[in-house]
Regions:
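Interfacial segments of alpha-helical transmembrane regions
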Residues: 5, 62-91
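Hydrophobic, aromatic-rich transmembrane alpha-helices
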Residues: 57-68, 129, 133-137
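Membrane-helix interface segments
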Residues: 38-39, 71-76, 105, 141-147
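Alpha-helical membrane-inserting segments
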Residues: 19, 27, 91, 95, ...
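Aromatic-anchored segments of alpha-helical transmembrane domains
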Residues: 14-20, 86-91, 152-164
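N-terminal transmembrane-helix/juxtamembrane module of multi-pass inner/ER membrane proteins
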Residues: 1-61, 96-118
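Membrane-embedded catalytic cores of phosphoryl/pyrophosphoryl-handling enzymes
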Residues: 2-7, 108-198
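Hydrophobic alpha-helical transmembrane segments of integral membrane proteins
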Residues: 79-104, 166-179
Length: 198
């Protein structure tokens, strides 16, 4: 782990702890106050980016487009996304059932833990979205692609809070987990000499 990586992990942990302690409940209360049918429609669209078959379709797109158009970088993106996505799926299930944090929709408060039915932390949608988007954010030379990837992943994270499926600290920590998995996948693919350059 490089020094900058360690600093980013520590800073993320401190931010998550502060939000968990002081901001989770007020942010969720604010989300409840601003609910509308338009916001609900937007939440449904954003949720689709992070769940179901959409992550697999993104990976498939990069692999196929890379092969068809002979863009080795896109193939490398697809391979790194596949590794990051698989790691996200496994790690989310392990942590989710170990942490036992209750979801905001149960209205038990941000400090309530009940292992049997509590699956708020981490947000699988957010970990997956940032794991895949993180590959592009870390490896793509295109600023436009990096910004679009970040905004799509961010929309997933915000939608999970607005849908009362996760606390804000859940999605912040989940975004950090996703980025860590993306960094590991990018380094693994680069080490295996799959080129991110044309």
């Amino acid at each position: 782990l490089r020094k900058i990586d360690a600093i980013a992990v520590v800073a993320s942990a401190i931010l998550v702890a502060i939000v968990w302690r002081f901001a989770d409940a007020p942010i969720t209360a604010f989300a409840e106050r601003i609910q509308s049918s338009n916001i609900q429609d937007t939440i449904r669209i954003a949720n689709r980016f992070g769940g179901g078959m959409n992550p697999a379709m993104v990976i498939f797109f990069f692999l196929v487009a890379g092969v068809v158009y002979r863009h080795h970088r896109w193939i490398a993106y697809g391979v790194a996304m596949a590794f990051a996505g698989a790691a996200a799926g496994v790690s989310v299930q392990i942590v989710k059932y170990t942490a036992g944090r209750t979801r905001p929709e149960l209205w038990l408060g941000p400090f309530h833990h009940a292992r049997a039915a509590a699956t708020s932390f981490p947000s699988g949608h957010t970990v997956g979205a940032f794991a895949l988007a993180g590959v592009l954010m870390l490896a793509s030379p295109s600023r436009t692609m990096r910004v679009i990837a970040f905004l799509l992943a961010l929309s997933v994270a915000v939608s999970r809070v607005m849908a009362f499926r996760h606390w804000t600290s859940d999605v912040l920590a989940s975004a950090a987990i996703g980025m860590i998995l993306a960094a590991i996948a990018v380094r693994a693919v680069m080490t295996a000499e799959v080129s991110f350059r044309e």
